[in-house]
Amino acid sequence: MFTGDADNVWVSVNRFFGEMIPTFDMARKVTLTVDLAKVIEDFKDIIAIAPEGPELLIPKDRLTDSEILQFYLLAAYVSFRLGKRLTDAMTKEELQAKLGKSMKITATRLGELVKQSIVTKTEDGSFRIATIGVKKLQEDLKAIKTEIW
């Protein structure tokens, strides 16, 4: 709380903000955030949000199993952020059905993604894409699109 006459309070307020704004600016520089509008724009040709759930618009045979899982989790993330889904997580069973491979392969790929911190496992055993996972997908997008098209 600032006390004193108006001039002293004004000086104190300016000093406070002068000290705090650089701290906020530094914190902003190291805080990892996702620009949802950019994610939607970047991935609009790859993922879709259907009433039935997350979908891919590209042939799965052009992607690795890990990429497929990441794209489905990204679609769930976007769907949740847009209020179209109750959670941004998907169960192992949902992901296995989307991947179209055995549960063992699905679990192995998910385990690898968790180990790389691209995906996180929730308390109930579901999976969600991590913020760093979204960023890495954005960084890898050009190479992935080259492989696809």
What are these regions (language model features)?
Residues F71-S79:
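Short amphipathic alpha-helical elements of helix-turn-helix/winged-helix folds
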Residues F80-K98:
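Short acidic, hydrophobic short linear motifs in intrinsically disordered regions
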Residues A97-K115:
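Short amphipathic alpha-helical interaction segments
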